[in-house]
Amino acid sequence: MQVNNLGFIASILFVLVPTVFLLILFIQTGKQSES
């Protein structure tokens, strides 16, 4: 099965963007609760 390059990149971005967004929120809330 040949994977479309653009579709492959889109799939990675589709997973990566929300993950990074959640990580940033998690780190910010963690720092706030510490102080």
Curated annotation (Swiss-Prot):
The UniProt entry lists membrane topology as: Single-pass membrane protein
Assigned keywords, A-Z = Formylation, Membrane, Photosynthesis, Photosystem II, Reaction center, Thylakoid, Transmembrane, Transmembrane helix
Q: Where are the transmembrane segments?
A: 7-28
Q: N-formylmethionine (modified residue): where?
A: 1
- Description of the deletion phenotype: Decreased photoautotrophic growth. Decreased assembly of PSII monomers and dimers, increased levels of the CP43-less intermediate. A double psbM-psbT mutants only assembles PSII monomers, not PSII dimers. A double psbM-psb27 mutant is incapable of photoautotrophic growth, but does assemble the CP43-less assembly intermediate. Cells are light sensitive and rapidly photoinactivated; recovery requires protein synthesis and can occur in the dark.
Q: Write out the GO biological process terms.
A: photosynthesis, light reaction
Which cellular component, as a GO term, is one annotated location? plasma membrane-derived thylakoid membrane
Cell compartments where the protein resides: Cellular thylakoid membrane
Report the main location listed first in the record: membrane
Q: How does it assemble?
A: PSII is composed of 1 copy each of membrane proteins PsbA, PsbB, PsbC, PsbD, PsbE, PsbF, PsbH, PsbI, PsbJ, PsbK, PsbL, PsbM, PsbT, PsbX, PsbY, PsbZ, Psb30/Ycf12, peripheral proteins PsbO, CyanoQ (PsbQ), PsbU, PsbV and a large number of cofactors. It forms dimeric complexes.
Q: Which PANTHER family match?
A: PHOTOSYSTEM II REACTION CENTER PROTEIN M
Q: Which NCBIfam families match?
A: PS_II_psbM (TIGR03038)
Instruction: Name the family the entry cites.
Output: Belongs to the PsbM family.
Q: What is the stated purpose of this protein?
A: One of the components of the core complex of photosystem II (PSII). PSII is a light-driven water:plastoquinone oxidoreductase that uses light energy to abstract electrons from H(2)O, generating O(2) and a proton gradient subsequently used for ATP formation. It consists of a core antenna complex that captures photons, and an electron transfer chain that converts photonic excitation into a charge separation. This subunit is found at the monomer-monomer interface. Involved in assembly of monomeric PSII from the CP43-less intermediate.
Q: What is this protein called?
A: Photosystem II reaction center protein M
Which organism was this protein described from? Answer: Synechocystis sp. (strain ATCC 27184 / PCC 6803 / Kazusa)
Q: Which gene encodes it?
A: psbM
